[in-house]
Amino acid sequence: MDEALTNASAIGDQRQKIEQYKLILSSVLSSNDLLQAQRFIDHILSDDVPLVVSRQLLQSFAQELGRLEPETQKEIAQFTLTQIQPRVVSFEEQALVIREKLAGLYESEQEWSKAAQMLSGIDLDSGMRAVDDNFKLSKCIQIARLYLEDDDAVNAEAFINKASFLVSNSQNEVLNLQYKVCYARILDMKRKFLEAALRYYGISQIEQRQIGDEEIDENALEQALSAAVTCTILAGAGPQRSRVLATLYKDERCSKLKIYPILQKVYLERILRRPEIDAFSEELRPHQKASLPDKSTVLDRAMIEHNLLSASKLYTNIRFDELGTLLAIDPRKAEKIAANMIGQDRMRGSIDQEEAVIHFEDDVEELQQWDQQISGLCQALNDILDGMAKKGMSVPV
C-alpha cells in the first residue's frame, strides 16, 4: 500500500492523482482494515498531498464511512477527527460529515449521549463558512433530544437555551414544535411540574395534523395531555395548581385518559389513599419518583401536600398528632409541611405551637373578591365596546 500511495503522490495531473487515490480508498474500505485506513488518512493529511486534494479525498472518505464495519467505523472516525484537529479550520465540512455519520451510528445503537457528544463537536459559530440559522437550530434541538433520551436534562437544557435565541425567528414549524416538546420535557425533569404541565397542555391542543413533512399523531397529543395531567398532580398544592386542575378537568379529552380517576379525585380535593397513590405511581417516570434529601420521594411530597390541602377543606382546625395519622406521616413532619405551605401562600391558615394545633382559614371571601374583580373588568370592557359602537367605530369580535 505504501508503494501505491507513493506512486499516486508522484502523479502530476491533479485529476488523475485524485482518481488514483480514490481507487486506493475503495480498496481500503473494501478490506475493512483499520491499520490500512489509518495509513491512508495519515498520508492524505501529510505535506505530500496538496490541501485541495486532501479535502476532496477526505470528503469522499467521510461519505463512504458506512462501508466499514461499525467498530472499524468508530475507530477510524475518531482517529481521523484527532488527526485533523490541529488543522480543523481547513477541514470543517469534512469533520461535519464524519461527526454526523458517527452520531448516526451511535444513535442506531441507542448510545444517545455519545451521539449527542459527537454532534456537539460541530462548530456552529464558524467564521470560515456560512452556517444557516435553521441548521444551527436543528442541530441544537437534535442534540437536546438525544440527551433527553438518556434523561440528561442538564446537558439538554444547555442546547435548548442555545436554540431559544434562534427559535423566535424560525419559520420552520417542525423545529418549533420539537423545541416546545424538548422544553416541556426539560421542565418536567427539573421538577418544575406546573410550568411543564402548561407546556404539555399547549402541545396537546395543536389542531394541525400535518406540520411540514411531519404527521401529528393523535397518540402523541394524548401523551402530551396525559403528561400535563401527571405534572399538575405532582406540582406543589396551591391556588395555581388548582386553576390548572380546573382547566384539565373541564377538558372533555381528559375523561378518556387512564389517569382520569385520580385527576377527578385531586380536582375534587378528595383525600387520596395509599392504593390510589400506588396505582398512580405505576404510570410515572423514574425522575417523577426520585428521592428527595429528606428521604421521601417527589410523589410522596406531592400527595402529602394534596392531602393536607384537602384536609383544610374538611376541618376548621386539627391537632398535629391527628393530622399526622390522617396523612400517615410523623406529626412533626406534618407541622413542617403545613408551615411551608402557609408561608408560601399555598394554604390559608395559622399554627398554634403551644396547643399543637393548625387552624385553617376559609378562602371563600377571597374567591368572591376575585369574581367581583373579573366581573368589574368585563363590565368596563363592555362599556368601552358600547362607546365605540355609538361612535360608529368597528368593534372587533
Swiss-Prot record:
Gene Ontology CC: COP9 signalosome; cytoplasm; protein-containing complex
Gene Ontology process terms (BP): negative regulation of photomorphogenesis; positive regulation of G2/M transition of mitotic cell cycle; protein deneddylation; red, far-red light phototransduction
Residues modified as N-acetylmethionine: M1
InterPro entries tied to this protein: PCI_dom, PSMD12-CSN4-like_N, PSMD12/CSN4, WH-like_DNA-bd_sf, WH_DNA-bd_sf
Annotated keywords: Acetylation, Cytoplasm, Developmental protein, Nucleus, Phytochrome signaling pathway, Signalosome
Ranges of residues in domain PCI: 197-365
Gene3D superfamilies cross-referenced by the UniProt entry: Winged helix-like DNA-binding domain superfamily/Winged helix DNA-binding domain (1.10.10.10)
Superkingdom of origin organism: Eukaryota
Subcellular location: Cytoplasm; Nucleus
PROSITE patterns: PCI
Cysteine disulfide links: none
Family: Belongs to the CSN4 family.
Role summary: Component of the COP9 signalosome complex (CSN), a complex involved in various cellular and developmental processes such as photomorphogenesis and auxin and jasmonate responses. The CSN complex is an essential regulator of the ubiquitin (Ubl) conjugation pathway by mediating the deneddylation of the cullin subunits of SCF-type E3 ligase complexes, leading to decrease the Ubl ligase activity of SCF. It is involved in repression of photomorphogenesis in darkness by regulating the activity of COP1-containing Ubl ligase complexes.
Record text on subunit structure and interactions: Component of the CSN complex, probably composed of CSN1, CSN2, CSN3, CSN4, CSN5 (CSN5A or CSN5B), CSN6 (CSN6A or CSN6B), CSN7 and CSN8. Interacts with itself. In the complex, it is located in the center and probably interacts directly with CSN1, CSN2, CSN3, CSN4, CSN5A or CSN5B, CSN6A or CSN6B, CSN7 and CSN8. Interacts with COP10. Binds to the translation initiation factors TIF3E1.
Protein name, per record: COP9 signalosome complex subunit 4
Source species: Arabidopsis thaliana (Mouse-ear cress)
